[in-house]
A protein has these predicted regions:
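Extracellular lectin-like interaction modules
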Residues: 1-292
Length: 292
């Protein structure tokens, strides 16, 4: 059963109605798309759509054209990502600005009705903090976008106040476009300071791991022409375990680490080679969470 949170393409289903599929074959796919909309309508969103099945399924979500948060990005890419079941959600998440990005946003979705989410934002430059609470009154309800701006170094802690009500956090980012990609017009050159959009489901702290494999592939057509592109791995671990984290068998440089607003934890943006290459991050401590 699928219960979309927005009217679907072609007016086939209205928000809140149930789509029932009774005879999907192995390997068969079913697409639910939001209704047609104007270019400026950024509120078209299927966030919080509920999907239930009596047999194992894989669910992928994404969008057709993405400018997060700016249409000025020179590559408004398609984005598709596999969703995870509620069993893999959590109640405590830690976010920071990501290296080589312009503006970041996070969205938090509730698994159950009446989930109270606490959002603590720290300005690491001034030491000030701000706490906000959002009540998500329905299962699948999503918070307004949580801005994590690059103008100040920010650290964010997101918690579900009720430990029995897990949440899921999507982190949306726009790369810095340090290559200043330009196009010529009849009147002037237009240069774009925002790069490709991307998204990632941020792992909850309870789902930390002992190892993480990754692969980097330089794909920017302007990479190396003006300013080389950069790859980073973002990891967060217990402060006492920073010396137990390794990248490809070697210790992670201590100067990469910063204390998170929760001083029991530290995070690092680890530079990776600008080459087609595999990498392995491992911990002999209590584990870590990370994205690339």
């Amino acid at each position: 059963k699928i219960v979309p949170t927005f009217n679907t393409y072609g007016g086939k289903t209205t928000a809140g109605s149930t789509i029932t599929l009774t005879n999907l074959s192995k390997g068969e796919a079913y697409l639910v798309a939001s209704k047609e909309h104007e270019r400026e309508d950024f509120m078209v969103d299927l966030s919080g759509t509920t999907i239930c099945s009596d047999k194992p399924i894989a669910v992928f979500n994404g969008n057709q054209q993405t400018g997060i948060p700016n249409r000025e990005a020179y590559s408004q890419d398609f984005m598709v990502e596999q969703s995870i079941p509620i069993e893999q959600w959590g109640t405590e998440l830690y976010l920071t600005n990501l290296e080589n990005t312009r503006i970041n946003y996070a969205l938090v979705t509730a698994a159950y009705a009446d989930t109270k989410v606490e959002i603590v934002t720290y300005n690491a430059e001034t030491g000030s903090s701000e706490t906000n609470s959002v009540l998500l009154d329905k299962a699948g309800k999503t918070t307004p976008p949580i801005a994590i701006n690059d103008s100040k170094r920010k650290e964010v802690i997101i918690r579900s106040v009720d430990p029995g009500k897990p949440i899921l956090c999507y982190h949306y980012i726009t790369s810095a476009a340090v290559n200043k990609f330009c196009t010529s017009t009849a009147f002037d050159d237009i240069c774009y300071t925002y790069g490709d959009p991307a998204s990632a489901m941020m792992p909850a702290w309870t789902h930390r791991v002992q190892s993480m494999n990754m692969f980097t592939e330089p794909l920017d057509p302007q990479g190396g022409v003006k300013t080389p592109q950069h790859f980073f791995a973002y990891v967060i671990t217990k402060t006492e375990d920073t010396d137990k984290l390794t990248l490809n068998g070697g210790a992670v440089t201590a100067t990469f680490y910063r204390f998170h607003a929760n001083n029991d934890l530290s995070y690092a943006h680890i530079p990776l080679p600008n080459t087609s290459s595999y990498h392995l991050i491992e911990s002999s401590g209590d584990g870590f969470i990370g994205t690339v």
